[in-house]
């Protein structure tokens, strides 16, 4: 039976449909918003695999080129591996729904969102998130939803719900928020140095507005009739938890006072190996291995969380507001354009900035059309950063997500193309990781760009905040460790300048986070950010005055657009010869802007002069140094500027009578000529005699 539910959501009509398409899936929802249509399906395994000890949720968001009336540009003319946009949207859907599955639910679940129709004014991410929420509710899979999702803009001091793509060009804020009826679960945003109050207001506003979508999903589920799965969580054995606590609690408390991550991890591993042996898990005579693992994790969590809530020092000895020790080095790689080594505790990022030309911009083939990005930030975290072995190669989803977050943080302070005509690439190599490596990439990226001489509008720093909450007691943690992220209730990353926030990312694992807690976290994050900014300014107060000697120099000039063909030449012959001769790279836009990139300044100036000569207009009455191209019986053809030739008549060569042109001129000879006339076809009449007369007159004067 086909069921349809529509509501007004912002300036668009939001429609959910089910019961017609993809009926073999456990649930399928067609979501429409404007002319954007997304099909979201959910399929779940009825039982968990033997020995499964984690929740295997997979979210795949995929865009089809036909959705925008396009044919893929690849050789095979079909969609290939996921684009960065698809990967980021998959993560955006995954993050708010993952915490809503019950603990110990290990059945495989797959969510697939396919964009079937794309409206240039409506991004498919919000419809896809809402569709995933609705499909999970209709599937009957254990899920504590639904969730709502909304995009919030901030234009002229007002919050805007689900702004169109064109409106986003004017907004100071692009924030996506998702949550249940009771609580916010996820926030992802970039901003133009906005205050904590404005950011918090946007989150609260988004949560209020999304209730419309949540109500629509609940009404759809009521009308469809949902059959809940017959799933019960495995019964816990209180006696097992007591036994494990007797065997390990004292040793664990001592282990969690070890400040070095590797030493602490090794000590804890040894404790659990001993516990497994004493309980007889390995030989099959003791309790179930999965039950023991869960009890061990619960004990770790209880120890760390209770210590923090009781006001005791954190794992590494800090209080809740202290940032780990920071060391910074800049300019450490001699041949790169800019580099920085940012170390905060046991998290370290080696960040490198590279300056390029317009042709180095990243070309992106998107559903909304092709465009280019002048700023790229790539994040790499090899396995050695955590003391492990593993696959090295193409970036994983996590690396792409962290890179995009760091990029969002820096975009607000970049100079405009008119101020600084370079394309920019920043690469963050995470060489050590113990929490908040993406925020280390923000700090290191800012310093590397300034080391490269990029005129940023200000320093940018990032910090990761955590939360421990039990009942009415809570503690906000500044600059969290990896263990605190793992055992805590929130991962809240905030980046910005001294003037305001430029990027924010929040993932909450529990319900019941209040506005007051979020405000406390934002205020505490500002304290930490200001502390880091002060250290960064001490090391590098401002950008380098000169760019690296190894970076390309860019010379920018403007020419008459009608002269572009002259610079390029037939089949590109002129510009090709020019670049080869001068050792430069030359890019010309349709409006006549010419960008000359060179490592050698002399080559750049030579290319500039040649282009100016090619595009220069010949002035009547002006004297030029011309080259004799060809001798004729009645005179000679002389080139006064590239592509500008004129006739030097035999009567204009000298004051005396000339019988033979060859007696006075030779091909290749440089002579001074005056332009006497230029007709409407551009033909020039030249004179050497007039130059001599002018010289004589000046001498007499």
Swiss-Prot record:
Q: Which residues form the KH domain?
A: 552-611
User: Residue limits of the S1 motif domain?
Assistant: 621-689
Q: Which Pfam families match?
A: KH_1, PNPase, RNase_PH, RNase_PH_C, S1
> Which GO BP terms, alphabetically?
mRNA catabolic process; RNA processing
Which molecular-function annotations from GO does this UniProt entry contain? 3'-5'-RNA exonuclease activity; magnesium ion binding; polyribonucleotide nucleotidyltransferase activity; RNA binding
> Keywords, A to Z?
Cytoplasm, Magnesium, Metal-binding, Nucleotidyltransferase, RNA-binding, Transferase
What EC number(s) does the entry state?
2.7.7.8
Main localization of the protein described in the UniProt heading: cytoplasm
Q: Where in the cell is it found?
A: Cytoplasm
Where Mg(2+) is bound, by residue? 485, 491
Does the keyword field hold RNA-binding? yes
Cofactors needed by this protein, per the record, are:
Mg(2+)
- Superkingdom of the source species: Bacteria
User: Which catalysed reactions does the entry list for this protein?
Assistant: RNA(n+1) + phosphate = RNA(n) + a ribonucleoside 5'-diphosphate
Which Gene Ontology cellular-component terms appear in the entry? Answer: cytosol
What does this protein's UniProt record list under function?
Answer: Involved in mRNA degradation. Catalyzes the phosphorolysis of single-stranded polyribonucleotides processively in the 3'- to 5'-direction.
Protein family? Belongs to the polyribonucleotide nucleotidyltransferase family.
Q: What is this protein called?
A: Polyribonucleotide nucleotidyltransferase
């Amino acid at each position: 039976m086909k069921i349809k539910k529509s509501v007004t959501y912002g300036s668009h009509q939001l429609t959910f449909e089910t019961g017609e398409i993809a009926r073999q899936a456990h649930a399928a929802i067609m979501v429409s918003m404007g002319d954007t249509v997304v099909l979201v399906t959910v399929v779940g395994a009825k039982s968990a695999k033997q020995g499964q000890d984690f929740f295997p949720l997979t979210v795949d968001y995929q865009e089809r080129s036909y959705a925008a009336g396009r044919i893929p540009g690849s050789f095979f003319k079909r969609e290939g591996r996921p684009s960065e946009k698809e990967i980021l949207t998959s993560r955006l859907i995954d993050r708010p729904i993952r915490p809503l599955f019950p603990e110990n639910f290990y059945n495989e679940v797959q969510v697939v969102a396919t964009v079937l129709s794309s409206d240039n004014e409506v991004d498919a991410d919000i419809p896809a998130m809402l569709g995933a929420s609705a499909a999970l509710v209709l599937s009957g899979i254990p899920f504590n939803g639904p969730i709502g999702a909304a995009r919030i803009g901030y234009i002229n001091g007002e919050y805007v719900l689900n702004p169109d793509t064109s409106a986003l060009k004017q907004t100071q804020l692009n924030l996506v928020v998702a949550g249940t009826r009771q609580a916010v679960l996820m926030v992802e945003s970039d901003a133009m140095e906005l205050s904590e109050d404005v950011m918090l207001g946007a989150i609260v506003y988004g949560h209020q507005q999304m209730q419309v979508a949540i109500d629509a999903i609940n009404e759809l589920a009521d009308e469809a009739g949902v059959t809940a799965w017959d799933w019960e969580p495995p019964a816990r054995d209180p006696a097992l938890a007591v036994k494990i606590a007797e065997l390990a609690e004292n040793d664990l408390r001592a282990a969690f006072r070890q400040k070095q991550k590797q030493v602490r991890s090794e000590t804890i591993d040894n404790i659990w190996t001993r516990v497994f042996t004493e309980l007889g898990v390995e030989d099959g005579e003791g309790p179930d291995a999965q039950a023991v693992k869960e009890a061990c994790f619960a004990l770790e969590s209880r120890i760390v969380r209770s210590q923090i809530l009781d006001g005791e020092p954190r794992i590494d000895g800090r209080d809740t507001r202290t940032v780990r020790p920071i060391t910074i080095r800049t300019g450490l790689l001699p041949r790169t354009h800019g580099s920085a080594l940012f170390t905060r505790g046991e998290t370290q990022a080696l960040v490198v900035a590279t300056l390029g030309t317009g042709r180095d911009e990243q070309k992106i083939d998107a559903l909304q059309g092709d465009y280019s990005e002048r700023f790229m930030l790539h994040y790499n975290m090899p396995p050695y950063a955590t003391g492990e072995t593993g696959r090295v190669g193409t970036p994983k989803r996590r690396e792409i997500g962290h890179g995009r977050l760091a990029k969002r943080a820096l975009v607000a302070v970049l100079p405009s193309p008119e101020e600084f005509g370079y394309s920019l690439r920043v690469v963050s190599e995470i060489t050590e990781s113990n929490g908040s490596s993406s925020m280390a990439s923000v700090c290191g990226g800012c310093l590397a760009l300034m080391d490269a001489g990029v005129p940023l509008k200000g320093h940018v720093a990032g910090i990761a905040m955590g939360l421990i909450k039990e009942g009415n007691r809570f503690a906000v943690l500044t600059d969290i460790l990896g263990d605190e992220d793992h055992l805590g209730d929130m991962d809240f990353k905030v980046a910005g300048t001294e003037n305001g926030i430029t990027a924010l990312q929040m993932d909450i694992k529990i319900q019941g986070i209040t506005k007051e807690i979020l405000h406390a976290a934002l205020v505490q994050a500002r304290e930490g950010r200001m502390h880091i900014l002060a250290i960064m300014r001490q090391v590098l107060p401002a950008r380098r005055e000169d760019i690296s000697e190894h970076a390309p120099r860019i010379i920018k000039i403007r020419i008459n657009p009608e002269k572009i063909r002259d610079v390029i030449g037939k089949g590109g012959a002129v510009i090709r010869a020019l670049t080869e001769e001068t050792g430069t790279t030359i890019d010309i836009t349709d409006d006549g802007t010419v960008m000359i990139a060179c490592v050698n300044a002399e080559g750049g100036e030579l290319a500039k002069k040649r282009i100016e000569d090619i595009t220069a207009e010949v002035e009547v009455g002006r004297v030029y140094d011309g080259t004799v191209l060809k001798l004729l019986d009645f005179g000679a053809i002389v080139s006064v500027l590239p592509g500008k030739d004129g006739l030097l008549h035999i009567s204009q060569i000298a004051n005396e009578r000339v019988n033979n042109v060859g007696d006075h001129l030779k091909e290749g000879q440089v002579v001074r000529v005056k332009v006497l006339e230029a007709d409407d076809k551009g033909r020039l009449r030249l004179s050497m005699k007039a130059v001599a007369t002018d010289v004589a007159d000046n001498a007499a004067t």
